[in-house]
């Protein structure tokens, strides 16, 4: 089905694709996104590899939530989910580019 040259070219192409994927994954591990809740009262910064780097809670919210621990917890959770969703979206867009042109289903292995 493949000649020596065809198979060799295919292997070289696969190796190049793997190297490019590793570079993209490394870049995603450093790419920071921000999720927020409560109109910016709670902000969470995380990488596209889901490493939380920063949690910022507005001083105004801390005063308001002094007697409402549950509200503060809900806002932190909502900001975390927002950040996670943005990280997933960014990662899927980046890694999805590697799946273009592959047979159906094969691209799922690269996500």
UniProtKB/Swiss-Prot annotation:
InterPro entries: YbaB-like_sf, YbaB/EbfC
Entries under Pfam families matching the protein: YbaB_DNA_bd
Main location: cytoplasm
Coiled coil: none
Keyword Secreted: no
GO molecular-function term, one example from the UniProt record: DNA binding
Subcellular location field: Cytoplasm, Nucleoid
UniProt keyword Cytoplasm present: yes
Any one of the GO CC terms: bacterial nucleoid
Record keywords: Cytoplasm, DNA-binding
Disulphides: none
Alphabetized NCBIfam families for the sequence: DNA_YbaB_EbfC
Subunit (UniProt): Homodimer.
Family indicated by similarity: Belongs to the YbaB/EbfC family.
Alphabetized PANTHER family for the sequence: NUCLEOID-ASSOCIATED PROTEIN YBAB
Role according to the record: Binds to DNA and alters its conformation. May be involved in regulation of gene expression, nucleoid organization and DNA protection.
Protein name stated in the entry: Nucleoid-associated protein NMCC_1355
Lineage: Bacteria, Pseudomonadati, Pseudomonadota, Betaproteobacteria, Neisseriales
């Amino acid at each position: 089905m493949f000649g020596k040259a065809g198979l060799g070219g295919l292997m070289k192409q696969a190796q190049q694709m793997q190297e490019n994927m590793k570079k993209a994954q490394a870049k995603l591990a450093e790419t920071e996104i921000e999720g927020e809740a409560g109109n910016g009262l709670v902000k969470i910064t995380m990488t596209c590899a889901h490493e939380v780097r920063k949690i910022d809670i507005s001083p105004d919210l801390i005063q308001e939530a002094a007697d409402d621990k549950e509200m503060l917890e809900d806002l932190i959770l909502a900001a975390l989910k927002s950040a996670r969703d943005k990280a997933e979206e960014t990662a899927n867009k980046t890694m999805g580019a590697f799946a273009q042109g592959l047979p159906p289903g094969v691209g799922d292995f690269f996500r």
